[in-house]
Swiss-Prot record:
Pfam families: GatC (PF02686). It is an enzyme of class 6 (ligase). Heterotrimer of A, B and C subunits. It comes from Streptococcus pneumoniae (strain ATCC BAA-255 / R6). Belongs to the GatC family. This is Glutamyl-tRNA(Gln) amidotransferase subunit C. Its EC number is 6.3.5.-. GO terms for biological process: glutaminyl-tRNAGln biosynthesis via transamidation; regulation of translational fidelity; translation. Allows the formation of correctly charged Asn-tRNA(Asn) or Gln-tRNA(Gln) through the transamidation of misacylated Asp-tRNA(Asn) or Glu-tRNA(Gln) in organisms which lack either or both of asparaginyl-tRNA or glutaminyl-tRNA synthetases. The reaction takes place in the presence of glutamine and ATP through an activated phospho-Asp-tRNA(Asn) or phospho-Glu-tRNA(Gln).
Amino acid sequence: MKITQEEVTHVANLSKLRFSEEETAAFATTLSKIVDMVELLGEVDTTGVAPTTTMADRKTVLRPDVAEEGTDRDRLFKNVPEQDNYYIKVPAILDDGGDA
């Protein structure tokens, strides 16, 4: 699957990143090769092969999911430089509100 320079530029703009034309072309080529390799892997016959999630022989240890009392909201907001009705206000980072 060919990734175009326009697609790379579009995603870069959404991420607020800027690349030169040479970098954009290189990313498009590299990403196209990666997608092609993933598509090729999808064609491999894995019939009879057990699913593998890790090569390490370890078990995940999880703590019990127990609800605990949180920090008192008023106490927490004493350290907040700017707030509005218990919402923490932070500086805007998107010029026009973004595409999100």
